[in-house]
Regions:
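Conserved, well-structured core segments that form or line functional sites
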Residues: 2-170
């Protein structure tokens, strides 16, 4: 009985994986105002493969940064070596290190030459939860360690740590 159950579970996981990785967003999706992109990113799924394991989460929280006119944006003071990705083609990852501790994942928006981005603040874990928990030094077998799945990827630093996103992805 457990053998058939595990085969069924594996088939369901495989079907979900295929559905998750079925459609990539075109770069044109990001070639517009970050506020629009941010609203439409909610509910989309971010997929990453780490050591041949599929990791996926649904976008549940974002922040839009408008570039030169936005004092909180990294691009507010213009192009630098650090933020040059924001001024490039839309749809690229802009990853930065903050407080000497955390990485943050942004996606560039706006036409090339203009800066804007959407910060991915939180994801709802979908696939690869044990791997994501281990990447955050949590024990996936300990119910108290991953008691609330919403907290596993709740925050830009947590989701980057869980998905293995660093400046190497910038």
């Amino acid at each position: 009985m457990s053998g058939s159950l595990s085969r069924k579970t594996e088939r369901q996981r495989r079907a979900r994986t295929e559905a998750i990785s079925a459609r990539l967003l075109a770069r044109e999706f990001f070639n517009r105002d970050p506020r629009e992109v941010g609203r439409e990113l909610l509910g989309k799924i971010i997929v990453r493969t780490e050591r041949s394991k599929l990791l996926a989460g649904r976008v549940v929280e974002v922040e839009a940064y408008l570039g030169a006119g936005d004092a909180a944006a990294h691009a507010a003071a213009g192009r630098t070596q650090r933020n040059h990705v924001l001024f490039g083609p839309p749809g690229h990852a802009y990853v930065y290190f903050i407080y000497g501790v955390h990485y943050c994942l942004n996606i560039s928006c706006m036409p090339e030459g203009e800066a804007g981005c959407v910060l991915i603040r939180a994801l709802e874990p979908l696939t690869g939860v044990p791997e994501m928990a281990r990447a955050r030094d949590l024990n996936p077998l300990d119910p108290t360690s991953v008691r609330d799945l919403r907290k596993l990827l709740s925050g830009p630093g947590k989701l980057c740590e869980a998905l293995g996103i660093t400046r190497m992805r910038d």
